[in-house]
Amino acid sequence: VAAVIDAAPEIGGYAVHAAKIARTGVPFFMSHTIKEAHGKDRVEGATIIEVDEDWKPIPGTEKQFDVDTVCIAVGLNPMNQLLRMTGCKIVDSPVLGGKVPSHSLNQETSVKGVYVAGDASGIEEASTAIIEGRIAGLAIAFRLGYLDEPEFLKQREVQLKSMVGLRSGSHGEARGKAKQYLNDTMEAQA
């Protein structure tokens, strides 16, 4: 990877991912965009250029890179078709990627006994999806009588604490707040 280029003035993704990339020595060029890709029959290079606060290119700030690939990321959308079919309440949360099911801290949706985790509950980091799945599993085990309440709450708290670091950075914090809003809304309706 020659560089990460983003027109935004700061990294919009999760800090954990940016840190992994930075540790490998890949440079970040914030407030930049790709001006041009070069090559005859394939990509052989790219020129980036700095942009101002209105995202307009600033002449004279071009930088050249020898690359054979240009990757573009444009976002993700939650997959909620099955949840809609079950009658789950769906809310709009642009921070979480769009239309997501309202759900509790235990990952239970507005339809009793229907739980959600991962991208279906809102686009977040993959490790967050795993933790949400664990929380949903614990809640189901508790509901079915395989865990008593103190043990369930103890294990759920361990999982919730492990999610804190994953929701660091401006992007992660915003998603954490959006999830908290969904949880609070469900608790108020209960």
Report residues per predicted region.
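Conserved mixed alpha/beta catalytic, RNA-binding, or beta-rich assembly cores of soluble enzyme
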Residues: F28, K63, D92-P94, T128
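C-terminal auxiliary extensions adjacent to catalytic cores
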Residues: K161-A190
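A conserved FAD-binding loop/helix module that cradles the flavin
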Residues: A117-V158
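A short alpha-helix-loop-beta-strand transition element characteristic
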Residues: V1, I90-V95, L147-L153
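Generic structural signal for well-ordered, non-membrane alpha-helical segments
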Residues: Y14, K63, G75-L76, V100, ...
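General structural feature for long, well-ordered alpha-helical segments within catalytic domains
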Residues: H17, M30, P78, G113, ...
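FAD-site-proximal beta/loop scaffold in flavoenzymes
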Residues: D68-G122
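A Rossmann-like FAD-binding core segment of flavoenzymes
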Residues: V1-R84
